[in-house]
Amino acid sequence: MNSSAIDADIPPSALAARFAAGPQLHAPEEAEKRLADWLGDVPADLAGAIRSVADRHPHVGVALRSIAEASPYLFDLIRADPARLLGLLRSDPEAGFVALLDRASAAVAAASDEAEVMAVLRKMKAEAALSIALCDIGGLWPVMQVTQALTDLAVNSVQMTLRFLLRQEAARGRIIPPNSDAPEQGSGLVVLAMGKMGAGELNYSSDIDLIVFYDLDAPTLAPDIEPQPFFVRVTQGLSRILQQRRHDGYVFRVDLRLRPDPASTPVALSTVSALNYYEREGRTWERAAMIKARACAGDLVAGEALLGDIAPFVWRKHLDFAALSDVHDMKRQMQTFRGQTEVAVEGHNVKVGRGGIREIEFFAQTQQLIAGGRHPELRVRPTLAALDILAARDWITYQARDELSVAYQFLRRVEHRIQMIADEQTHTLPDSVEAVERFSRFFGYESREAFARDLLAYFDCVQGHYGKLFEGDPTGTVKLPIDYAGGPDDTGLLDHLHGLGYKKPLMVATTLQQWMTGGYRILKVETTQRAFHEFVPMLIEELARAEEPDNAVNAFDRLLQALHRGGRLISLLSQNRDLLTLVALVLGAAPRLGDMLARQPQILDGLIDPRFFGAMPDRAELSARLAATLADAGPYEEFLDRLRLFGQESLFLIGTRILSGTVSTQQASVAFADVAEGIVGTVHDLVSEQFISQYGRIKDQQTAILAMGKLGSREMTASSDLDLILIYDFDHEQPDSDGERSLQGAQYFARFTQRLISAFTTRTNYGVLYDVDMRLRPSGRAGPLASRLDSFAEYQEVEAWTWEHLALTRARVISASPEFRERIEQVIRAVLTRPRDAAIIANDVAEMRHAIAQEKGEDDVWDMKYAAGGMVDIDFIAQYLQLVHAAATPEILGVSTLGAIDNAARLGVLAQSDAEVLRPAARLYHDLTQILRLCVSDKFKPETAGEDLLRVLVRAGDAPDFSSLEARVKETQAEVRAIFNRLIGGDSA
C-alpha cells in the first residue's frame, strides 16, 4: 500500500486527526534534520506514510520534530518500531489502549515462563508509554485522563503478573484455587495501591507504591505450605517481573516501603499484624497515605474488607485538628521553608517545592483527616475530587477549589513533560536558563519568560492557599502564659522547659532571664528588646526540637553576645518567623554551623540577601563575588582574612540551604567545589605574586595545582579537606631564580608549596581557610612537597601503586596556565589509558577494600563511606572499571563517580541493571553524607539524634519516615555489596 493510501485511511477518531496542540521547536533546522536522518533509515513506504501524516496534520509534524529534539526517551520508542508509531497515529487511542491491554492479558495468560511474561509486559509498556505521551503532547487527553491511563496500565500490569505467578504456584501444587483461570480470587492475598496509583493519578515515570497483605488462614494454600514464605516469594516475584531492567526496558519500578515498619518486616505482611501495627503505632503520614489506598490486585473482596478494618485508624471520630500540625511537619520535611522572597524557576521541584503539587495534595488531605471521621463524604481518593467535596461542604471556598484545581492540573502537566524527556522519576525543572528555554518550548510555550510567568503565578497561588491553612493556632486553644524571665527559681518555667525536652532547665532558665531582662548589649534598646520578646516563646520551642537543645540555647546565647548591632537582625527575625525557624534549625541541627554563626555573626547577612533562596551561583558569579570581597583589601594578611570570611560565609550559606531543603545535596557538592576552586585559584595567584616579589622567577617556570579526591571529583561536603598536588616545571638549564634572594629548582618550589599550604592552614582571627592534605603526591609523605612534571610522569608510569592510579581517576587541574594544564592532562590520560590486567587490578582493589574494612570497620550502617556496600565500594567499582577499560574505551574516564558509572553503562562495560542500582545508591549516600558531615562531628547514632536532624535526614533521603530511610539504606548497601563482590571479588561481607 502506498503512503497516500495509508494516509487516506486515517479516520476522524484517529490520534493524528485529533491533534489539537503541539510543542514549539527550539532549533527547527536541527529538529528537522534529526527526524529526516531517522526517516532515511526507515523503509521507503513506511517513511513516506509517516511523512505524509506529519505533512497533512501539522501539529503531528511539529510534535515529532520536538520529540526528536527534546525527548531522547520518546524518540527511542519511535525509532525502535516505526510501524508502531504509524499504527498509533492512524488509530483511535482510547480503543487502541483498551485493545492493547486485552492483547497483553491474553498473551500473559498463554505464556509458559517468566521471561515470556516479561517480554509481553515490556512491549505493552513501550506502546502505552508512546501512545499516552502523544495524547498528552497533542492535547487529545486532559491531564487527569492521562493519569488515569497510566494508572490503568499499572493496575493491569500488577494484575496480569500476579495472576501468572499464582497460576505457576497452582501448577506446582502450592495453592488449590477454586477458579484456575483466576487463582487470585479467594486467595486472601491483597495488593493495595497507594498514593497516586490508588487515586488514579499516576505520573508518567512514577514508581508504583504497593503494600502486600495476606490472610494467615489463606483458604487456597495447600495444607503443607506456610503462608509467610509463600506470599513473600510471590511478592518478590511480582516486584522482579515488573521492575527488572532488560534490553527491552522495564514495566514499573516497585516500591514496597510504605508497609508498616519496613526496616524490620518482610515484604508481605499478615493482615493481623498490619491491623495491630496501625492500632498501636500508626502515624499521621500513614493515615494520610491510606486516604488514597485501593485494593488493586489479588483478592479484591478481602482487600475491601481490610480497608474497612483500617478505616477507624485513618478516620477519627472527632474533628482531628492535631493532624494539621502533623501534616505541616511532614510537608516541611520535603519542601523548602515558607517565607522565601524568591522562587527560582530553574531547578525548582514542581512536586515538593514551594507552591508545588504536594502543597495542593496536603491542603486537601489535611482537611480530609481533620473532618473525614465525622463527615464520610470527604473520604475520596483523587485530589480534585477532594477539592470538589471540600468546597461543596464549605470547608474551602469555591474560589480556592477552582484556583487550586487549575494549578494542580497545570503542574501535573509540567511534571509529565519533565519525565517524558528521559523517563526519569524527577520533578525538577532544568538548572540552567537555556535548558528551561528548551523545556518551555517542548511544553508548548514560545519562550521561557512566558512559561515562567504562568508557572510563578501558579506557585504564588498555591502558596497563598496553603499558607492560610496553616496560620495561627489550628486547635483554637489558648496556651497558659509562661514567665520566661522567671529564672531558675520559677518552678513553672522549669517544668515547662523540662516538658519541652531540655535536659538542663536550670541553665536554660538562667539564660532566658538574661535575655528577657536586657542583660546583653544588643538588648538594651527598648524597641529591639520588645521585638526580641515577641519571638522568644517560639524560639525556645524550636530549639527544643534540636539534636542537643541545651547546646542550641548556648549557641544562640553566644550569637546574642557576639552581636554588636543587633537591632536590624532582631527586627528581621521578629517579622519573619520562618527565618527564625531556619536559624533555630541551624543552631540545633548543625552545631558546626551554629558555632560558626556565633563566632562570625556577620555571615548572617547572607541569609538576608534576597538571592539566598534563588538559584545557586555558578563559578562565574562566585568569582565575581570573591573579587568584590577582595577588591579593596590592603596587606597580605587582610587578603587572607577576607578569604576566610568569604569561605566561611559560603560554607554557612550552602550548609543552611541544605538544611532548609532549598538546594539539593548534589547542587551543594558542586557549590562547595566551586567555592574551593575559586579560593584555591585566588590563593595560588596571591602566593605566587608574593613569593616572586621575594625570590624572583626561574626561567620558563610553571606551577599548577592538581585537585584530587572530593575536590577533584566535585563531590565535596561541608567538612571536606583539600587533597592537592603541586606540579611545576622550568628551564632545566637555568634553575636559579632571578630575585634578590635566589633559590634553586626543587628548593624554590618546595618553599613555594610550604607558603601555599600556610596560606590555607594558618589560623587568623577568622580561623583556617581549609585543611590541606598533600599525601596523594608521589611517594606520599616520603616524597617532596612539589613534583616536577617529568618526575611526576615517570613516577606514575613506573613506581605508582594501583591505589595511586585509582586516585588519579579523580585528578583535575584547577589552577594553571592553559598550556601547562594541557601537558599535565596528557600525562594523566596516558597513565590512565595504558593497558592493564583486569584480574590484577581486581585483586588489588579487593585487597585494598579488605584492608580498609580491617582498619575502619564496615558494620556501621550509618557510616555511608566505609559500611559494607557503602560509598567506598561504589567508588572502587567506578575507578576499577576506568582502569581496566580506559585503554580500549578512553571515553569511560570521568572524575566523578556518577559520571564514570554513566560512561561505563553507556559503553556497555557495566550492566544497565547494575548501573540502575549504583546510581541511586551513590546519590542516596551522598545526600545523607552531606547532612551528616554538616550536623554530626562524630559517629551518627540514631537513638541519640534529635528530631531536627532526623527530619532533615528523612527529607534528604526522600523517605516518609526514619524507619523507612533506614530500611532503604540497608537494602541499598546489600545490593551494592553484591555488585562489588560480583565485579571485583574478595567477598569481605
From Swiss-Prot:
InterPro entries: GlnE, GlnE_rpt_dom, NT_sf, PII_UdlTrfase/GS_AdlTrfase. It catalyses: [glutamine synthetase]-O(4)-(5'-adenylyl)-L-tyrosine + phosphate = [glutamine synthetase]-L-tyrosine + ADP; [glutamine synthetase]-L-tyrosine + ATP = [glutamine synthetase]-O(4)-(5'-adenylyl)-L-tyrosine + diphosphate. One of its GO terms (cellular component) is cytosol. Residues 1-474 are annotated as: Adenylyl removase. Residues 480-989 are annotated as: Adenylyl transferase. It holds the Pfam family GlnE. SUPFAM superfamilies: Nucleotidyltransferase, Nucleotidyltransferase substrate binding subunit/domain. Its cofactor is Mg(2+). Keywords: ATP-binding, Magnesium, Multifunctional enzyme, Nucleotide-binding, Nucleotidyltransferase, Transferase. GO terms for biological process: regulation of glutamine family amino acid metabolic process. One of its GO terms (molecular function) is [glutamate-ammonia-ligase] adenylyltransferase activity. Its EC number is 2.7.7.89, 2.7.7.42. Involved in the regulation of glutamine synthetase GlnA, a key enzyme in the process to assimilate ammonia. When cellular nitrogen levels are high, the C-terminal adenylyl transferase (AT) inactivates GlnA by covalent transfer of an adenylyl group from ATP to specific tyrosine residue of GlnA, thus reducing its activity. Conversely, when nitrogen levels are low, the N-terminal adenylyl removase (AR) activates GlnA by removing the adenylyl group by phosphorolysis, increasing its activity. NCBIfam families: PRK11072.1, PRK14108.1. Belongs to the GlnE family. This is Bifunctional glutamine synthetase adenylyltransferase/adenylyl-removing enzyme.
